[in-house]
Design a protein with these regions (language model features):
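Glycine-rich FAD pyrophosphate-binding loop
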Residues: 1-2
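Mobile amphipathic helical/loop "lid" adjacent to a hydrophobic cofactor/ligand pocket
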Residues: 5-9, 16-141, 145
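A short acidic, glycine-rich active-site loop
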Residues: 10-14, 157-158
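Helical element adjacent to the flavin cofactor pocket in flavoenzyme catalytic cores
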Residues: 140-181
């Protein structure tokens, strides 16, 4: 930024103790400092009053006008319903994509376009058109394993202190030059 260099992580950014035990062990063994991180999600639809974040009711209704917006309320209802019903054992078509499943479940356009597709796009750094092509089975398993279908008791997320450069430099310093020839 300007003349100041700012480190940017482009690989993994956050992790938790439940889902990433080997990574945690790797950081501990290599004395890599970690710190708590915030794993939040928000959406603002340009040129509309449609916006929310996932931080409690005040976040969901950060724009109070949405308390009276039927489409917004339907999206919130669909979020609750989808999260409650999203179980791999309920899926009979193991080859179905996320996009086709969402259509089959008759979920609102707002839920699809302003919640689940943007969230998938953000997590996997993919364009929205590609998010719908994701295999449903993979999506459900990932969200279940990472506690993303929970409204309460989600895992605490962490990141590497001073970002990935810290552990990359630490590991490189422990490897002899002969491995890089």
């Amino acid at each position: 930024i300007g003349k100041k260099k700012v480190p940017v992580d482009i690989g993994f950014i956050v992790f938790n103790f439940k889902t990433y035990p080997n990574l945690i062990k790797f950081f501990e063994e290599n004395k890599i400092d970690i710190e708590k991180s915030d794993m939040s999600f928000s959406v603002k639809v340009e040129n509309s009053n449609f916006e929310y974040c996932g931080k409690g009711l005040s976040g969901i209704f950060s724009n109070r006008m949405n308390l009276f917006n039927f489409k917004f309320l339907k999206m919130v209802f669909d979020i609750v319903k989808f999260y409650k019903d999203s179980d791999l054992s309920n899926v009979t078509d193991k080859e179905i994509t996320l996009g086709n499943y969402l259509i089959k479940k008759n979920l609102s356009k707002e839920f699809i376009n302003y919640h689940i597709i943007p969230m998938v796009s953000a997590i996997w750094s993919m364009p929205p058109y590609a998010a719908g092509k994701m295999p449903l089975k993979f999506f459900l398993k990932f969200f279940q394993n990472h506690g993303l279908f929970k409204f309460k008791n989600r895992p605490q997320w962490y990141t590497v202190s001073k970002r990935s450069r810290t552990y990359v430099e630490s590991i490189i310093s422990k490897i002899s030059g002969q491995h890089f020839k």
